[in-house]
From Swiss-Prot:
Pfam families: OTCace, OTCace_N. Pathway: Pyrimidine metabolism; UMP biosynthesis via de novo pathway; (S)-dihydroorotate from bicarbonate: step 2/3. PROSITE patterns: CARBAMOYLTRANSFERASE. Catalyzes the condensation of carbamoyl phosphate and aspartate to form carbamoyl aspartate and inorganic phosphate, the committed step in the de novo pyrimidine nucleotide biosynthesis pathway. GO terms for molecular function: amino acid binding; aspartate carbamoyltransferase activity. It comes from Azobacteroides pseudotrichonymphae genomovar. CFP2. It is an enzyme of class 2 (transferase). This is Aspartate carbamoyltransferase catalytic subunit. The gene is pyrB. Carbamoyl phosphate binds at R51, T52, R101, H129, Q132, L263, P264. Its EC number is 2.1.3.2. One of its GO terms (biological process) is 'de novo' UMP biosynthetic process.
Amino acid sequence: MKKKDFVSITDCSKQDILHLIERSAYFERNLNQLLLKDKICATLFFEPSTRTRLSFETAINRLNGRIIGFSDVHTTSSSKGETLKDTIKIVSNYADVIIMRHYLEGAARYASKITDVPIVNAGDGANQHPSQTLLDIYSMYKTQGTLYNLTITIVGDLKYGRTVHSLLNGMSYFNPTFHFIAPEELKLPIIYKQFMDENSIQYFDHSDFLVDIINQSDILYMTRVQRERFNDLIEYEKVKNVYVLSNDMLADSKDNLRILHPLPRVGEITSDVDTNPKAYYFEQARNGIFARQAIICDVLGL
């Protein structure tokens, strides 16, 4: 059987995505399974993570799998100069699947080419975060009842935000309309605009976070400005609090509007939004368990 990886959402067809959404719903209805009994899952986090790592580990535990790995690269042989190739080769001897986050773009793709063990990308630099995309799409499906013809407004860091880049690819099959709100320093890279042009996806660029745009939206996708992507602290300080969503901005929004955020947040959503029924970011994070159960079982052919 040909090895299967989950490296980029661009590797997924429309049918692949719909199948994974269906499987996510199955795992939400049937949370505790024995599907990973006798399976060892390696979680290799070369970059800090809380939500993604714990979500994957919860997904594995719910499926009765066992976990090996690390969350602090400084405690591993990588800190002694071991190459990524050698780390992957060694861990492949121990595990049935490798879930990895790395600070280098393309690291997961590279890993997938040097091992026969399935690779699941838990984020590679500013490139892709496909498991987040699947849980985002599942959250949209759950809250909207459809994936088709949604108006999606994305706010904040569109340049470095790998969740944003993956989401554009994943939703491209479903005729979305996008509104992009970002300061000049964090605008969406041209390669993604070219992708949308090539796929006849309608999108609008904005610099101002206007209530009128919120009121048109089915999904409001907030993102944080990522301090770790900036070499210049002054540049970060200039843009970190440019856009802040407060509860009063939602007064005339559509009834079906839901607010998503890949988390963590650092001030771009005020705490008074948390009790608004349109806030969905905490439920969204929980959906990650089911989406990641679906991904792991899919690459293992279970």
